[in-house]
Amino acid sequence: MNASREPRPILSGPVLTRVGGIPVDALDIVADPTRLLLAELAAITERLRRLSEPLTDVLFNLVPRLDDDIALRRKVLSGKRAVFNLKRPPWDQDTLDRVTARLTPAEAGLLEEWMRVQAARAAALAKLEDQLSRERAETVQVLRAALDGPGVLESMAIAAPEWVRHADLGAATPRNVKTLYSYVSRAAVKTSPFSGLTTVGVAGNEGGGRARSRAAAAMAMLALHRLARSPRTAHLLTYRGAPVRPAGGDAPGSLLLHGEMAIAGGVIWRQDSVMEADHAISWLDRLGEDDLSFAQVLERLGGADPFARFIRLLDAGVLTIVLPWRLSEAPLERLAELVDGVPESPISADDLRTAHALGDAAHRERVKGRLAAFDGLGRYARSWADPKRGRPVPDALLYEDRETEAVLPDICAIPSVRDDLLSLGELMRPHLFRSHIYDLMLEEFVAAFGAGGTCDDPLAFFMRLAVERDGNGPLDVAMADDMRARANPGERAWLPVGPTSAPPSAAVLFQLEAEDYAQVAEGRYRLVVNHFSAGSGALFTRFVRLLGADFRSRLVRHIMSTRPGVACRELVLWTDCNTAQAECANLLPPLSLPGEPTRPDAITLDDTRLVHDAGTDTLSLVDRRGEPIGLTYLGLIPQHMVRSYARLLVVLADPWVNASPHSDYTLAKLPELLARCRPGQVVPLPRVQHGRVVTRRASWLAPTSALPLPRSGETPAELVVRMDAFRRAHGMPEEVFVHHLGGGDFFTAGDRKPLWVSLASPTSAQVLEGWLAPGVEYVRITEALPARNAHPQLDAERRRRATEHAAMLIWPEES
């Protein structure tokens, strides 16, 4: 299909709304008296600043006239320095009287006013100190009270079980306050679905408060490998040699597809690598290409101790386990069925069923029940794990999603909102371009099979492109070319793709700022664009089981509408070990990759061919009858984070790079933002707005050394006055979000979510200090937009809730 040059998209599919799990007023940690005192002190400081220069001149001119009183001259010099620094001269009353006596009446009046303003400042500071002392205790109480909302503490028991279990949640200790502040602010103003800290619903519906939970997918993988390594249960499973293909071309030898579970920073994935088969090829020749029973494996391996060989090949990834569960099945329950009646099993069927039940029932439990579920799952995970062989205990053992109970308006049915999104799409479209990785596949395919050619073994083709020797030069170059093209895609935005590939699309994540939805309906609002994601539906599929049949069918219709007349299949990836990926799967008939669970209507790459259309110079995947396959990747893991041969497949499914600058996502702007940072300077960047649509919040790039963080020996009042002065000096609002900008490595900015900060709260400054990652030199400070008091969604108690909406835009193919 040719990419349409019509810039206006269409809205497609359901609209997903994320709802904050805690009302935004839970962050009312700064009282009005504090704001009034800070305003008073700011006015006093401004008055002192105006007085400072003339009074400094007065004292400077006085010094030469004090040769007759050296001691007084020294005191005047120290007083001059104090005035220059807007401080009270360090004089007693006698010194003040003696200095005044040496001045003219006008000069004395200036000094008297300085001392009077300084006294007013000292009085205001004392009041502020008292106010902050009360506010500190009230802050902890306010934050702690937020945990008492419906379902909040239950969600916290999943997010931070050890804190909920052991901490005094209302304690004013720095560590507890930091944890309390971080979670409450996240649930109140950062709409990122996690248990009940952010709930989800379908726009236009009233949420039913449904929930679902499960044990982590990695739990089943730990158990599976434990069973495979035991001679008492290895016979219950089926095995297969790792995929191997000829190196192709002039390259000798064979290539091996090696997969292993990897865990880092709490994220679990299957790390697939294409490498030279080397000495593994002799073993793979023995094993053959078919599925094998345990007895067949031992027979083919032979030797004095075939089981030892079996274990070595299993650990090396040369031999793989065929997953015994299907996509629609609960993995732990399926393993329990396998070991039923095997008394010598290293893991009992009862334990496997109990582990499944603990995860499956957790969403119905209160706090104690959830903590008990964590305890049970933790015991099982520790007994099944094998850290020495790269299978440690996962950080996240329990997964939960929750549906909102709110009535959610169909915001995209409001004509002005709909028109704003479509107009945004017009701005975006020239910045959506075909990836250079697609070009690489085209070039390599035509070189190997000729224009209009056919490849009967697509897996071999993708493996050859992704082989890892000293890096992967061509693939790395293509990714670098994509980065360079983001600034000016030009004609790349209009390059064609085949029927396997999706047309340009995007999911727009946005928020509305208005007093209420009546104002939105009248067109009196701001639409703030937070981020773009894949328009395939990948952001939505995680919630299909939660949100029900109608949501599912609308999502399927959306996917099918992107490729009319083409049978679509889902590219399944990492569902064996990554829980979120597993939750996203099973919407469409799958194209199953090696290492993935399957289902009866699944096909593999062995059931397909890759073909080139010489007329359009595009690639398509077809079945053995020659019918095109519409391929869609629906995983939560963004496709730019997928590596090895699977990266080529996700690019074939969706070849479009979204380089649109029309969202306020810090990580996407990181190279640009870092280039604009200046040592020792706070660099302001203005808000960018197109009518009602805000595509970039006002922000400030600041060295971490410039931030008003706590100082040793400083009182809370002195700290908060510095914070207030910092924000006023740079024109910042009181409430902001702080984002990391790089540091130790390129991805540091993505390691921690933005932190909500009140620049009128010493508690915020203390939390900010602990939040900053080591090695981060710069931060981006953004205005909090929408403001907390301008979220239009109200809960049943008429309290405001932060909401974020996700709507999908597609640009249909050119007719």
Where are these predicted regions, by residue range?
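Short acidic, hydrophobic short linear motifs in intrinsically disordered regions
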Residues: E289-L301
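Acidic, low-complexity/disordered tracts enriched in E/D and polar residues
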Residues: S4-R5, P9, V177-G288
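Surface-exposed recognition patches
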Residues: E260, E299-R300, A304
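Type-3 copper protein
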Residues: M1-R214, H279, R286, P306-C577, ...
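Short amphipathic beta-strand/extended segments with alternating polar/hydrophobic composition
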Residues: G266-E276, D457-P458, P628-I637
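C-terminal structured domains
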Residues: H531-V779, E783-A784, R801-E813
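Segments forming glycine/polar-rich beta-alpha architectures that bind adenosine-containing cofactors
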Residues: R229-A234, T238-V244, Y438-G452, I603-A614, ...
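Short polybasic amphipathic segments
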Residues: S254-A262, F445, D516, T618-V622
